[in-house]
A protein has these predicted regions:
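Small-residue-rich segments within alpha-helical transmembrane domains of MFS-like 12-TM solute carriers
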Residues: 32, 36, 118-126, 158
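Cytoplasmic helix-loop-helix junction between adjacent transmembrane helices
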Residues: 115-151
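A generic transmembrane-helix signature of 12-TM secondary carrier transporters
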Residues: 91, 97-98, 113-114, 187-188
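Short hydrophobic/small-residue motifs within alpha-helical transmembrane segments
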Residues: 63-65, 154-155
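Extracytoplasmic
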Residues: 20-53, 71-74
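Helix-loop-helix hairpin linking two adjacent transmembrane segments in secondary transporters
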Residues: 148-192
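Conserved MFS/SLC helix-loop-helix module at the cytosolic interface between two early adjacent transmembrane helices
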Residues: 69-105
């Protein structure tokens, strides 16, 4: 490393330096697990909420639109607010969206919640990955960084469906929303310790 060991100044001194980037990578995976509506439980959602398949897919498209529309603002937010503020607001947004999404039956409101969840999801992921970019590649080599980023994103998509299916098999499809809300509480706990 060019200037000594990699350190993230937003962590307190008791957190070991070697653990700091791994914690941020873990938080990025947690943000990518979130979705508001989980397609692994598509058929159960259709049956229990009396919705059509296209309605649920529109929720996913709203989530993607939230990420795409908010993306140009990410750098402005990064330079305007602190790391703690951005991660805390993103985690709170994902937490609230996951808690209320299973109970909404009015479709435009559900689409809006999924849209907001997508904005929070991209904010949290971007904040984590941009902070550990120099740990992954000290020379800012994007041929190293983007494969890592794609592993996090695509791996989390697969893992999200696996977890959703497992929780749905043993419990109920809404337990994935509760699971992600619990993970967001862990993110908030990390931010405040």
């Amino acid at each position: 490393v060019l200037n000594g060991p990699f350190v993230l100044p937003m962590f307190r001194s008791f957190v070991p330096r070697k653990m700091q980037p791994w914690i941020y990578l873990f938080i990025a995976v947690i943000f990518q697990l979130s979705g508001g509506v989980y397609l692994g439980a598509l058929n159960q959602m259709i049956g229990s909420m009396s919705l059509m398949r296209e309605d649920i897919l529109m929720c996913m498209y709203a989530n993607l639109a939230g990420m795409a529309i908010y993306f140009p603002l990410l750098f402005r937010m990064k330079f305007r607010f602190t790391n703690k503020t951005l991660l805390t607001s993103a985690a709170l947004g994902v937490l609230l969206c996951n808690l209320i999404a299973p109970h909404i039956t009015f479709l435009p409101l559900l689409w809006l919640v999924c849209f907001i969840e997508g904005m929070c999801k991209i904010q949290g992921t971007f904040e984590c990955m941009s902070n550990i970019q120099l740990w992954m590649t000290p020379k800012r080599d994007f041929t190293v960084f983007f494969p890592w980023l794609h592993i996090v994103i695509l791996g989390s998509i697969q893992l999200s469906d696996l977890i959703t299916t497992r929780l749905m098999y043993h419990y109920h499809w809404t337990y994935m929303n509760l699971f992600v809300a619990g993970l967001m509480l862990i993110v908030l706990l990390i931010q405040f310790t």
